[in-house]
Structures are given as C-alpha cells and as structure tokens.
C-alpha cells in the first residue's frame, strides 16, 4: 500500500518540476533574445507601449460615451412619458370637441361656424383683439408674447353620463363643450385687456382693464385665466336656467372654481391635469 502511494505521488511532482524547468528555459530564451537584438528590441517595445496607451485611451473614451448614454436613458424615458401624456390629452380633446368646431366645418363654412360657435363680445373684446394684433410693436408687451391661451378642458361622454339625472337634465355633450369654448374665449379677452397698453384702448375700456388688472393681481387669481359673471352674454352660455345648469356641471367636474372679489363673481379656469 505504501509503495503504491509513493508511485501515485511521483507524477504530480514530476509535472511541477517540468513546468518549473519550462519557465526557466523561457526566461533564458528571453534574456538571450534581449542581449542579441538590443538596438531593435527597445524601439519595438516603445512602439508597442505607445499602441497600448492609445488603445487604453480609446477604451476610456468608449466607456465614457457609454456612461453618458446610460445616464441619458432615464431622461429619455421621462420625455416619452410626457409625450404620451400630452397625446392622451389631445386625443381626449379631439374626441370630445363639439362637431361644430371641427376643422372641416371651419374650412367649408368659416363665417357661419364662427358666428354660430363663438360668443358675440362687446366693443371691449374687439378692441382687445385689435390690441393683440398691434402689441408686437409695443416694447412693454414683449415679455408676454408666449402667454398660453385659456385652457379648454372639454368634458367626455363618460363624465356627462356619470352625473345624476337631476344634475344632467337635458344637457348634451355638445352644449356643455360649446360653453367651455365660450368661457375660455371670455378668459382670453380678459387676458388681452390686462396686458394691453393704455394708448390702445378707449377710455371706457381702459377703466375695465384697470379693474381686471386688480382682479388678476389678487392672490386667488394670479397666474390663472379667469372670466366674470358679467362677461356671460351668450350665445352658447347665458345666465338662464340652462346656463346656470351648465355652470353647475362645470363646477362639479372641476373645470373651474369661483371666488368673490369686490362685487364681482370671478370664475378661475382649471388646467387639465
């Protein structure tokens, strides 16, 4: 048994000795090669070192670029999510847009649809529109060029159906959405008057503009689009029973909230979430 164990232990020792001898011979060959060609070996080694350094630099550059791309992925995902959210909002608006306000109707019967769908404003609204056309030449109005229009957050069929029959009454989707477009037009007209210079307005309109500016500067209204109860004059929304029912529905669905400022009842439009 002992002899057998000794014979089994011998081959591994021989293998280690052979491997050690092989390493020694390789080192000897390398020493000989270096001593035989010293003049050519050093430049070659220098070239190899330069190439390796250049490759390391390229690898570092690639690694840095990859890290930049990885860091940009979360930002790109957020941008895609925002785009999808905006697309949902636009699809919701398009699906619930009153038929009389669609593009084809405007293309075929622009005058008729304009008179049917948009409210007939008084002289102050007309002057506010003229002011907007001229305001580009007015230095004080330059910072407000990018002001967004009043929000038009149309309701959907599902929202209308979710109301109690008592609240819904005889209201239709089209009637309510036409009213939404109309009150947004009131808010746009007020925003124009708030920003329009005095020299562009008549004396009567200027007095109203000053009053609107005081309202716009109040804490509850500041930074938001608004209209007054006094602005409601039709044709799509009037202060009759139907109009009051529409206002109740819009308030219930969160399209606006109202505050009392002085003797005015002020409706502040909500933005779509």
Swiss-Prot record:
Transmembrane annotation, as ranges: none
Keywords assigned: Coiled coil
Coiled-coil boundaries: 77-97
A Pfam family hit: SKA1
Gene Ontology molecular function terms on file: microtubule binding
Gene Ontology cellular-component annotations: mitotic spindle; outer kinetochore; spindle microtubule
One GO BP annotation of this record: attachment of mitotic spindle microtubules to kinetochore
Cystine bridges: none
Family assignment from sequence similarity: Belongs to the SKA1 family.
Name of the molecule in the record: SKA complex subunit 1 homolog
Protein's organism: Zea mays (Maize)
Top-level taxonomy: Eukaryota, Viridiplantae, Streptophyta, Embryophyta, Tracheophyta
């Amino acid at each position: 048994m002992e002899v057998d164990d000794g014979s089994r232990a011998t081959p591994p020792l021989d293998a280690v000795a052979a491997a050690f001898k092989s390493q020694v011979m390789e080192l000897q060959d390398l020493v000989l090669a270096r001593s035989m060609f010293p003049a050519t070996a050093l430049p070659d080694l220098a070239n190899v070192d330069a190439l390796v350094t250049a490759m390391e630099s390229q690898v570092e550059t690639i690694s840095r670029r990859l890290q930049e791309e990885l860091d940009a992925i979360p930002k790109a995902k957020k941008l895609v999510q925002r785009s999808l959210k905006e697309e949902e909002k636009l699809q919701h608006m398009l699906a619930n847009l009153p038929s009389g306000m669609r593009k084809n109707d405007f293309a075929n019967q622009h005058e008729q649809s304009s008179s049917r769908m948009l409210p007939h404003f008084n002289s102050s609204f007309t002057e506010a529109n003229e002011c907007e056309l001229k305001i580009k030449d007015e230095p004080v109005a330059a910072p407000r060029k990018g002001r967004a229009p009043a929000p038009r957050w149309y309701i959907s069929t599902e929202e209308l159906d979710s109301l109690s029959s008592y609240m819904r009454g005889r209201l239709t989707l089209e009637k309510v959405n036409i009213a939404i477009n109309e009150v947004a037009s009131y808010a746009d007209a007020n925003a124009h008057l708030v920003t329009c210079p005095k020299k562009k307005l008549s004396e009567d309109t200027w007095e109203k503009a000053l009053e609107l500016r005081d309202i716009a500067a109040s804490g509850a209204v500041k930074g938001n689009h608004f209209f007054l109860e006094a602005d409601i004059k039709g044709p799509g929304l009037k202060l009759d029973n139907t109009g009051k029912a529409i206002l109740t529905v819009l308030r219930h669905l969160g399209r606006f909230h109202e505050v009392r400022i002085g003797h005015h009842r002020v409706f502040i439009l909500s933005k779509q979430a």
